[in-house]
Curated annotation (Swiss-Prot):
Binding site for [2Fe-2S] cluster: 104, 110, 113, 150
Gene Ontology biological process terms, A to Z: cellular response to cAMP; cellular response to forskolin; cholesterol metabolic process; electron transport chain; hormone biosynthetic process; P450-containing electron transport chain; respiratory electron transport chain; steroid biosynthetic process
Modified residues (N6-acetyllysine): 64
Highest classification ranks of the organism: Eukaryota, Metazoa, Chordata, Craniata, Vertebrata
Family stated for the protein in its record: Belongs to the adrenodoxin/putidaredoxin family.
Naturally occurring in which organism (per UniProt): Bos taurus (Bovine)
Protein name, entry field: Adrenodoxin, mitochondrial
Gene that specifies this protein: FDX1
Domain of life of the native organism: Eukaryota
Length: 186
């Protein structure tokens, strides 16, 4: 959870510095917080810790690579992305014209950032997780080179790669079966 918060915070802050306050609840049982001292920090007390999150002061061109997206209309959108950023981050930060892309904002709750990779790039990607695979099962236009853009982070080896957005989009959040007694909320 903390790692995800840091990733989201880093993406939101970009190259600016920010400060985040994290609340840590004590573990159940006697003794309160591990390592706490003094009265008032046991039981149900809440300790506050300040965490500083900051990006690099300036991004050099060496830290960026070129990525080509082919959107649903067949138009090629070329942009730059920072090494380490996800493909979802690249689309959002560069305001690329890809309708509905990243509806869940990278929380692995939809499949709207479904992308199809070139074979030579696909072979270099990190192994797919079970969670990503479950979301991809709900995606339209699934291929053997499909991945979710929110799960793929840029590396130097991806420079000048081309990824294709499938012709149709599917949002897994809209295809959840709520059971026989559920009604559609409009």
């Amino acid at each position: 959870m903390a790692a995800r918060l840091l990733r989201v915070a880093s993406a939101a802050l970009g190259d600016t510095a920010g400060r985040w306050r994290l609340l840590a609840r004590p573990r159940a049982g006697a003794g309160g917080l591990r390592g706490s001292r003094g009265p008032g920090l046991g039981g149900g007390a809440v300790a506050t810790r300040t965490l500083s999150v900051s990006g690099r002061a300036q991004s050099s061109s060496e830290d960026k690579i070129t990525v080509h997206f082919i959107n649903r209309d067949g138009e090629t959108l070329t942009t730059k992305g920072k090494i380490g950023d996800s493909l979802l981050d690249v689309v959002v930060q560069n305001n690329l014209d890809i309708d509905g892309f990243g509806a869940c904002e990278g929380t692995l709750a939809c499949s709207t950032c479904h992308l199809i990779f070139e074979q030579h790039i696909f072979e270099k990607l990190e192994a797919i997780t079970d969670e990503e695979n479950d979301m991809l099962d709900l995606a339209y236009g699934l291929t053997d080179r499909s991945r979710l853009g929110c799960q793929i982070c840029l590396t130097k080896a991806m420079d000048n790669m081309t990824v294709r957005v499938p012709d149709a989009v599917s949002d897994a959040r809209e295809s959840i079966d709520m059971g026989m007694n559920s009604s559609k909320i409009e």
